[in-house]
Amino acid sequence: MKFFVIALIVLLGLLQYRLWSGDNSLPEYFVLQKQIAAQQEGNAKLNERNQVLKEEIIDLKSGTEAIEERARNELGMVKEGETFYRVVGGDRSVSSPSQ
């Protein structure tokens, strides 16, 4: 009977060792859970970005308005007969009147 109790205690000790400090231990599990959560958050951001790019591609394929807008904004192009005006702003901060 004593041998059985000692064997159970030794077995319990070995299992506790594996649980807390061996391979696939609880601390390692929690670290991996944090890494998974961070990766899923990053994946969600990338999926959102991909969706925006897909919508932009569809818009570019379907009509000329998006192409014209990109040409105007990114390449500085103007239509024939249009006049381009550049508005140069001064100080953008709004100051309140001093009292």
UniProtKB/Swiss-Prot annotation:
Sorted UniProt keywords: Cell cycle, Cell division, Cell inner membrane, Cell membrane, Coiled coil, Membrane, Transmembrane, Transmembrane helix
Cytoplasmic-side positions: 1-3
Coiled coil stretches, renumbered: 31-73
Residues on Periplasmic side: 22-99
Any single Gene Ontology cellular-component annotation: cell septum
Chief localisation class: membrane
Matches recorded under InterPro entries: Cell_div_FtsB (IPR023081), FtsL/DivIC (IPR007060)
Compartment(s): Cell inner membrane
Source organism, top-level taxon: Bacteria
Membrane topology: Single-pass type II membrane protein
Single GO BP term: FtsZ-dependent cytokinesis
Residues annotated as transmembrane: 4-21
Family: Belongs to the FtsB family.
Protein purpose: Essential cell division protein. May link together the upstream cell division proteins, which are predominantly cytoplasmic, with the downstream cell division proteins, which are predominantly periplasmic.
Subunit annotation: Part of a complex composed of FtsB, FtsL and FtsQ.
Name of the featured protein: Cell division protein FtsB
Organism for this UniProt entry: Shewanella sp. (strain ANA-3)
